[in-house]
């Protein structure tokens, strides 16, 4: 979460008159994050999160994102719930931006996730996939295989200034992925960005997921692969198989992977690493110093890409056979 658009108390008060959430007592910006402007609101009725959607978020996608949160909450998944305005809408306008209010989720994200946290996230992700199975809306993943080559072409010319040989490495990975990407795996609603800062905990207990603004309809096992990349590598870029096994055990205890999904995990994990390397690389090369967008080091994901090239079976990620459906 972050703050790119400032608001004052007068315009906020006018905006809040469209909601039945009590009287505003205080508000403050939330500094973390990269995509939208977020504020923590305290009112006489409780705490809420106000989000102003910045230019990177397509307004046409907002009904999907907010509708998904509403749907998942009704299915018992812990996540922020959109607050409906007095006119029945979930989206308003504030400071020239589309804006929405969601409920406040208790907990904090884990900067050093443990094995227990990884298992809980895997289990929670599987519950999310099942809860989203009957969500009627669809949204194409705008950052999947067909999008990677065009995104890469925007950075390709300067990529070797980040790391010598990165052009050749990335070209080889994209060639491999385009030839081997699975076509017929189970699809549904995925989070697509379930990094540690998007999962809240109270102690070791998962209290819920946040930030559904990359959610889309895509391969379910790809979401698992994103999590393996996001949760199971240490600061020295080594893969923690114990954490991987815990995450996969948690997931498959709720939703076992098919044999085809298990066999595709290598390709999906490699693809997930490429996806996040490419977006980081683009920002690294194009976002000017002092910009509100927080640049993240693409080399963290180059190192993951190199790891995945050496993997020969899903067992090396920690997948146990009892987690694979017969």
Curated annotation (Swiss-Prot):
It comes from the Bacteria. One of its GO terms (biological process) is threonine biosynthetic process. The keyword Oxidoreductase does not apply. InterPro entries: Aminoglycoside_PTrfase, Homoserine_kinase_II, Kinase-like_dom_sf, Pseudomonas-type_ThrB. It catalyses: L-homoserine + ATP = O-phospho-L-homoserine + ADP + H(+). Pathway: Amino-acid biosynthesis; L-threonine biosynthesis; L-threonine from L-aspartate: step 4/5. It is an enzyme of class 2 (transferase). Its EC number is 2.7.1.39. Gene3D superfamilies: 3.90.1200.10, Phosphorylase Kinase, domain 1. GO terms for molecular function: ATP binding; homoserine kinase activity. Keywords: Amino-acid biosynthesis, ATP-binding, Kinase, Nucleotide-binding, Threonine biosynthesis, Transferase. Belongs to the pseudomonas-type ThrB family. This is Homoserine kinase. It comes from Brucella melitensis biotype 2 (strain ATCC 23457). The lineage of its organism: Bacteria, Pseudomonadati, Pseudomonadota, Alphaproteobacteria, Hyphomicrobiales.
